[in-house]
Structures are given as structure tokens and as C-alpha cells.
Amino acid sequence: MILKKIKSLRKFFILIVSIILFSPVLFSANISSKHSLSILNSIGTRDRGLMNSAFLIPKDSSAVFINSSSLTTLIRDSINLNYTLTPNFKEEYLFNASYSHTDNVYAIGIGFASELSKIKTYNISRQKENDILSGNYLINLGAAYMINETSYIGGNIKAVINNFDNHNIFGGFLDLSYMQSIFNPALKIGIGIKNFGFYDKVFAAIDTDIITSIAYSKEDSSFAVALEYDISVPSVSHKISLGLEAMIIDFNKLGLFDSNIDYDDLPESVLDEPSHMQKRHLTKLPSGILGRLGIGNKGVSLGLSLYVDLFRFDYAIVFDNFNKNNISHDFGLSFMF
């Protein structure tokens, strides 16, 4: 019975993916322009340091922006906050926040992102007038289901509001994702469809992204490597990125923090949980300093993290399009509980 349900879920997922893949192409003749919204691609600072390649290797609630199916692999409930300092930081303000809850066989997440820009205005005499504040806002609701201990499926519903001088433009989008462990739990493959929907009353006005990825990540978070390839349709643009993460200084090995958890210390409610939930609660929490490197056809990035048990501080510097004049600095905080 369980095997039949798994096969049915996979068939349903393949059907939905096929419809999404070909729908933009079928309707492309009626679309006047193709473009993307940067706010739809909001991500956490950790993923920025990996040059957007963390599709299969999440560590916090920002997974709701990237790949909801991976929410079920998080070992704790999580809150994540991120701020981006752009080259035009005096006129641009980029922020996102997320929360996730992981249960027995499901997980849920919610994310909010905002992009605010100051636009200077001048009168006929070229005298400066009041600035106009333009904003993009995103609300992202994600959910995931664990088919079995190696397969996960997830989806998102996203709403976008573009506000400019009291004028609003609305959009609605759908994401779907699937990931699976192969050979051993540390090696994963996955596929996702992002940003399928409408914007300003036009279907497929925004590119739909098709994502494929393969990654290897050690359970103790000391090492991870990921390769991701994206294609956007119907504009047919490509993105490939490779990310590497490694522990530089391990506080646990130095004896600075004791992250070991004994069954005797756990409440009975945890001991009554299924074995995979017990494994999550018993997972040794990383503590230390991690370094990251990401490179792809869209640029290069470097990142650092300070892990202390349930707290993590992230930093990333991103050279978009390999341009020294287009450098962004990202700062992030994560809390698990």
C-alpha cells in the first residue's frame, strides 16, 4: 500500500512538472516580454556564499525560498534573517526573513522578503523634489512531505506586490521540488520548478526556472559540495554554479562546546517519536567557523559562518557577473530551537 502511494505521488509530480515545463512555451506567442523579478530569487546569506548552489544542502529556514522539499531534512525549527548591502546601499534596502517547523513526516515554512528603492525626482527647473519610495514585497508559503527516509517532495505558493508611487502590481507563483538520497544519505539529487505563474495579469510574464542539482553533504556539517544547473524559460537563459563549504575551526573537536545529547537527557515526548525524529534531535550540532566558496557563470562569492550550537552568524561577499564595481555584502542570522 505504501509503495503504491509513493509511485502515485511520483507520477503526479512528473505530470505537474511536465505541464509546467511546456505551458510557458505553448503560451509564449501571446507574451510581449520576458523578464525576471529579483525578489522571487531571494535567498539566505549562506546560499549567497555558495553562489546560489544550496538547493540540496539547507541548514536553516531560508530553504523555503530555495527548495521547500529540503525543509524536512532540517534538524530543528528555525528562524533566519538576512540583509544585503548593495553597491547602491544608500538607495537600496534588501531584507528577508523566514521561519520553518519540521515535524514527523512534514515540514512547513513561511518567508517574507522586501526590496526598497529610493527614486530621486526633479521638477522642470531641475530642482530636487521629494524622493519616491518603490518597493517589491514577497510572501512565500512552503510545505514539504517526506515520502520515505530518502525521498522528499515540496511546494510553494508565492505572492508578489510591486508598489510604485501608490500604484500596485500583483503576481502569484507556484514552486515544486523533489529531492532524493542515492547510495547513501549524504549524496542527494533533486529537481525543481520555480516561479510558474502570472504577473500583472499576464501568464508566464516572468521566466519559469527549471533547476537540477547534485550535492554531497556530511551529516556533521563539516563539509559540503554542490553543483546546480538552472534554465529559465521561455527566455532560455542558463545558470550553473558550484559551491564548496568546509569547517575551518571545529569548536567541538577543541572541546569548547559540548553538543552531545544523551537519550537520558531527552523528554519522554521525544523518545516516543519515530526513529528519524530521534535522529534529528540527537544530531550533534556544529560549532565552529566555516568557509565557503561559490563560482558560476553569474559571478563568484566567498562566505564565512560562526556556528555556536543553536546560533549561526553568516557573512558573504558576492562579485556579481565578476564585476569589481558590482560587489554585494550579505549578513545573516539563524536561530534553531
Regions found by a protein language model. Give the residues of each.
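N-terminal secretory signal peptides that target proteins for export/translocation
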Residues: 1-10
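Bacterial N-terminal signal peptides
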Residues: 14-24
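Subset of outer-membrane beta-barrel
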Residues: 29-337
